[in-house]
């Protein structure tokens, strides 16, 4: 865990005037989570990051890593236990890729075989052929490949904490997305505590478990990506995340988040049509989903067809043209609804059981209601 307590950094300008680059910042990043420090240039993000591994000394306040105050730690030992990734990559041009990756492990006394094995493991994580690249030098690799090496080098000694200062900023958009996706896959497996600096709202929304928005050295809001978009704290945050923030939420909210807010109303194949009609009439719905004994959707019965009809639901059940998964984001769901020219569809869990229904109206209601997918226990500045 990373904990910042009243962290402040004050510089003296050329004319002798004091300037608070970081002003009384309080922030908790739980173990295994990624927090993105987001804001415009000069707002204190990078200064905050550099104080964590003591590249810059704080003017006041405390930094705790897993409960230990960094002021009480040897600076060299501290840095060897923190992975650090910068935009400029910083690979050593006179070292091979293997030597670059294993700089810190070799400092820690790892033997050659262990270093090589670790380098091969990390190369595999970013889809680079170890046999092809480990003996090469940085100049023999593309910019995107070098950036991958910069990321895995920071992970070589398996540090619990990773600091990243705009790590993907110098890469072209196509490579950036690939590297971001690879890094997310690694993070899901490794569960490092990560603090990442960015000025890109889309990158922050994609990568962060939580986002701390900086302005003039202070945190003005710290929230989950979905909450940040749904409930910006003030006009500055709202303008920074963009006027299309509701559309951005489509990528963050899952179908299951929406169906969890809706009543689950179903019938069985053997349910009398008169009973099914009564249920639909009571809840003012135009159709009811029919499920089997395992809870899997078989189709639906229309209210107008069940009115005054005899028999059971199985007699007039219409099969579904499409179904969605609970983990699908709303962008995928909307796309499938539009492609199929239908207004609603059933959502199923990983075992294929009925989870509820989702419609264009439900999605609009959810996004406009201000509800968020989860609440985080976040300590932010007042």
UniProtKB/Swiss-Prot annotation:
Residues 2-241 form the ABC transporter domain. It is a peripheral membrane protein. Residues 258-320, 322-373 form the CBS domain. InterPro entries: AAA+_ATPase (IPR003593), ABC_transporter-like_ATP-bd (IPR003439), ABC_transporter-like_CS (IPR017871), CBS_dom (IPR000644), CBS_dom_sf (IPR046342), Gly-betaine_transp_ATP-bd (IPR005892), P-loop_NTPase (IPR027417). SUPFAM superfamilies: CBS-domain pair, P-loop containing nucleoside triphosphate hydrolases. Transmembrane segments: none annotated. The complex is composed of two ATP-binding proteins (OsmV), two transmembrane proteins (OsmW and OsmY) and a solute-binding protein (OsmX). This is Osmoprotectant import ATP-binding protein OsmV. It comes from Salmonella typhimurium (strain LT2 / SGSC1412 / ATCC 700720).
């Amino acid at each position: 865990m990373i904990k910042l307590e009243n962290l402040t950094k004050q510089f003296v300008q050329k004319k002798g005037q004091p300037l608070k680059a970081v002003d009384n910042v309080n922030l908790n990043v739980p173990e295994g989570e990624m927090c993105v420090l987001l804001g415009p240039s000069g707002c204190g993000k990078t200064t905050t990051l550099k104080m964590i591994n003591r590249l810059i000394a704080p003017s006041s306040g405390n930094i705790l890593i897993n409960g230990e105050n960094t002021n009480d730690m040897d600076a060299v030992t501290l840095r060897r236990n923190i992975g650090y990734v910068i935009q400029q990559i910083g690979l050593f041009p006179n070292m091979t890729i293997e030597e670059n990756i294993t700089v810190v492990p070799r400092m820690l006394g790892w033997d050659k075989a262990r270093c090589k094995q670790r380098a091969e493991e990390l190369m595999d994580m970013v889809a680079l052929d170890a046999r092809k690249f480990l003996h090469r030098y940085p100049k023999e690799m593309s910019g995107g490949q070098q950036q991958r090496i910069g990321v895995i080098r920071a992970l070589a000694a398996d540090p619990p904490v990773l600091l990243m200062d705009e790590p993907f900023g110098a890469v072209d958009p196509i490579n950036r997305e690939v590297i971001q996706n690879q890094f997310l896959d690694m993070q899901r497996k490794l569960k490092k505590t990560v603090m990442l600096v960015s000025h890109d709202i889309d990158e922050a929304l994609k990568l962060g478990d939580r986002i701390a928005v900086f302005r003039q050295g202070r945190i003005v809001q710290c929230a989950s990506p979905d909450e940040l978009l749904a409930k910006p704290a003030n006009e500055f945050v709202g303008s920074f995340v963009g006027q299309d923030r509701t559309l951005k939420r489509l990528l963050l909210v899952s179908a299951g988040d929406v169906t969890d807010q809706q009543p689950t109303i179903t019938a069985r194949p053997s349910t009398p049509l008169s009973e099914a009609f009564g249920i639909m009439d009571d809840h003012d719905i135009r159709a009811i989903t029919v499920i089997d004994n395992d809870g899997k959707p078989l189709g639906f019965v229309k209210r107008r067809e069940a009115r005054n009809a005899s028999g059971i639901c199985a007699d007039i059940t219409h099969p579904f043209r499409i179904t969605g998964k609970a983990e699908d984001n709303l962008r995928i769901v909307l796309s499938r609804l539009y492609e199929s020219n239908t207004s609603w569809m059933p959502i199923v869990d990983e075992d294929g059981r009925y989870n509820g229904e989702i419609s264009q109206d439900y999605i609009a209601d959810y996004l406009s209601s201000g509800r968020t997918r989860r609440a985080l226990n976040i300590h932010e500045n007042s």
